[in-house]
Amino acid sequence: RLMIRVSKVFLFVFILFVFVNNQVFAQLTYVLPYPSQMPGNKFYEINQAIEKLSYFWYFGNFGKTYYYQRLSDKYLIEAKTLFEYKQYLLAYKSLLKSNQYFEKIYPYLLSAKKEGKDISEKQKIFREESLKHLEELNKLKKSTPEEFLWTPEKAKPTRLNIRSLIDTSENIRKKYL
């Protein structure tokens, strides 16, 4: 009798472990990178130059897809971090960059498909990236103001429509789901 109870408990724990483990795995399929150098850091400009030069390192449709995915992720995380520190102007610019790079990904996938390459795995990754970006953008929407008036010391103020930009960013990602 004790053996039957122990085996039932063991079976329950095993099933629970498998179920919980699968849920965690489903949430972690696409991982965004750790933020790199931020604007204002003395190495930021160097990283920008390396980033531009690395464009030539990634050739072919799959190479360019990877290159633009990497940059889109990088600038989304940069924007997220800057928004958290209330550096709204820099964050706004970073999110614009992320959008620009994100929109360059899909045409390269289409070109690869036209060349007869199997893009199913790359499309899956692109979809996971889109979903992860949407998740982060949704968090940003909840934690940022709708608008912000950026007032530099010796220049005209700039109105940043943060909510509108986040909505645009979401629409760009949803377009490819």
Label each region the model flagged.
Residues 2-11:
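Bacterial N-terminal signal peptides that target proteins for export
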